[in-house]
């Protein structure tokens, strides 16, 4: 166990946006990754640990959680590598399998975060102030959450349909960040009215109902870690949702390397519904609004472009 080892070397790791990241070399010569979010919101590390455990249940390519507290997360150290077409194809197949493992509900049974911003993981009709995370907040090791739907015996596909997904997506994933973006001045009154009009169109543009998928939830290209043997998923905001959301956000900000191979690998395992390409901007709108809510006006034009494309 991590707590039984002495840490003999601390090496800062660049790129962390939600805390101080370090590579810790232990007394037995092994390395782990540690992220400290001491100044972040309470529970942010617990939320990430919950998500990693939950995705690992589906055999997703996520690092193993060694331990965590409310502000510290320790996981496997993943050696950096280079993206390759074969690793991209494998990533696509892994994503399809992860999504297909499903969830029994939209959202998640723990309070969520995306970056440092709260993420409302309640279901569509849940009016409670918050949800309790499984387990005690002060334990280092967390039991894996078991909230997955029973697979269809013939296809292994979860049978819970996402008939409520469009309304849930608007209520829990779009409206909160639109409000934050207006409150911080990233979007003015006219911008907000335009995006609000787009939100009213979501139910008619959402495509056919699908089973609830097990999502990474913050899958922009920066949350892919290309290692020496495969691509790993890091920094999740995991929850039950629509699988096209994860795939759409992979195309943001230059797109994931070999994205065509990722999508081809995905289609081998779980083909996408007709018209999925036309729904990309709808699904990207969530993460773009998260960015105006957190970083301000510099993402305004991308939000408006996505809204116009819905």
Language-model features and meaning:
Residues 1-10:
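Juxta-kinase regulatory segment immediately upstream of eukaryotic protein kinase catalytic domains
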Residues 12-22, 26-164:
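ATP-binding pocket architecture of kinase catalytic cores
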Residues 59, 99-107, 181, 206, ...:
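A general structural signal marking secondary-structure boundaries and capping sites
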Residues 132-143, 147-205:
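Hydrophobic, aromatic-enriched interface-forming segments
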Residues 158, 166, 170, 179, ...:
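Active-site Asp-x-Gly
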Residues 188-231:
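A mid-sequence, solvent-exposed acidic-amphipathic segment
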Residues 261, 291-310:
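ATP/Mg2+ or Mg2+-diphosphate-binding catalytic cores
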Residues 281-289:
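Hydrophobic alpha-helical segments that form the core
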